[in-house]
C-alpha cells in the first residue's frame, strides 16, 4: 500500500513538474499549416473540426483539405504548407467500407495531382469500421507513437470513438484525447462531426467541449437555392473570419469551386445562427 502511494506521488510530482510554466520559459509560435484565404484554420499542436448535416458533402470537403496538405499547395480555397519532417498525413475512417474508403483515397490523390497507380509515402489511410471504440483509440494511439513525421491527422468520424454519444464523460475523454495527441506529437487533428437536424436528441456535451477547445469549426451546408452547391463557412475560428466559399462535384466525382457562387445570395433563406448545442458527434 505504501509502495503504491509512493508511486502515485512520484507520478503526480512529475505531472506537476511538466505542467509548470515559468516566466523564464520561451515558447515559439505554433506553426501555421492550413489557411482559407488569409485566415489560419489549422496550426500544429491543435485540433479542429468540420460539421454539417447528412449529404452536405463533408467528406468531399475534407478530401480537398487533405489534398492541399498532401500537395503543400492549394485545392478549392484551402492552402497548406506542412513543414519538413511533418509532411505525413494519417487519415482514419471509422464508418465506411474499404471500397468507399478507397474511393476517398483516390479522390485525394487526384485532387493533389498525384498518381493513383502508386502508393504515396506521405499518406496513410486506415479503415477501422469493424472495430470497437476502445480498439480504434488504441490503434490511433499506436500509429502516432510508432510512426514519425505525421503533421496532419483526420478522424472521420469521431462519434465511433465512443460507446454512448449521449455520455458527457465519454465526450470529455475523447476531446481530451484530441488535445493529448495534438500536443504530445505536435500534430494537427481534424475531426468530422454531424449537425443536429433540429430535434433535442444528443445535444450539448460534445458541442460544449468543441466550443471550449477547438481551434476552428467549419460548417458545410447545402445552398438553399442550389442544392448541388455546398457552402463552407466558419462556425468558430480563433483567427479572423474568412469569406464563405462554395463547391460542386464535377462529372469526375471531384469537388471544384462554384465560380458563380455569391455568399450574399442565400441571406434571405438563412436560418438562425448555429450554436454548439446543435452539434453531435459523427
Each language-model region and where it sits:
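Conserved catalytic network of the ASCE P-loop NTPase/AAA+ motor domain
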Residues: 42, 81-85, 115-118, 145-147, ...
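The Walker A/P-loop phosphate-binding site
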Residues: 4-108
Amino acid at each position: 500500500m505504501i509502495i503504491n502511494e509512493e508511486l502515485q506521488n512520484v507520478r503526480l510530482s512529475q505531472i506537476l513538474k511538466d505542467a509548470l510554466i515559468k516566466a523564464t520559459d520561451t515558447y515559439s509560435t505554433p506553426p501555421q499549416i492550413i489557411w482559407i484565404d488569409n485566415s489560419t484554420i489549422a496550426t500544429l499542436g491543435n485540433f479542429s473540426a468540420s460539421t454539417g448535416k447528412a449529404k452536405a458533402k463533408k467528406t468531399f470537403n475534407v478530401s480537398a483539405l487533405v489534398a492541399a496538405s498532401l500537395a503543400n499547395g492549394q485545392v478549392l480555397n484551402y492552402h497548406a504548407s506542412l513543414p519538413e519532417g511533418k509532411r505525413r498525413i494519417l487519415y482514419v475512417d471509422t464508418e465506411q467500407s474499404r471500397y468507399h474508403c478507397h474511393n476517398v483515397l483516390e479522390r485525394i490523390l487526384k485532387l493533389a495531382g498525384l498518381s493513383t497507380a502508386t502508393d504515396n509515402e506521405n499518406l496513410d489511410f486506415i479503415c477501422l469500421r469493424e472495430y470497437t471504440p476502445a480498439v480504434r483509440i488504441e490503434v490511433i494511439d499506436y500509429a502516432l507513437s510508432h510512426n514519425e513525421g505525421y503533421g496532419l491527422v483526420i478522424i472521420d468520424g469521431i462519434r465511433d470513438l465512443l460507446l454512448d454519444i449521449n455520455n458527457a464523460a465519454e465526450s470529455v475523454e475523447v476531446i481530451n484525447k484530441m488535445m493529448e495527441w495534438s500536443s504530445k506529437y505536435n500534430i494537427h487533428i481534424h475531426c468530422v462531426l454531424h449537425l443536429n437536424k433540429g430535434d433535442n436528441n444528443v445535444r450539448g456535451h460534445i458541442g460544449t467541449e468543441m466550443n471550449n477547445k477547438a481551434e476552428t469549426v467549419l460548417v458545410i451546408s447545402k445552398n438553399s437555392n442550389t442544392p448541388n452547391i455546398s457552402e463552407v463557412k466558419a462556425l468558430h475560428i480563433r483567427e479572423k473570419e474568412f469569406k464563405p466559399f462554395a463547391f460542386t462535384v464535377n462529372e469526375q466525382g471531384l469537388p471544384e469551386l462554384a465560380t458563380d457562387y455569391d455568399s450574399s445570395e442565400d441571406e434571405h433563406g438563412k436560418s438562425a445562427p448555429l450554436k454548439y448545442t446543435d452539434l453531435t458527434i459523427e
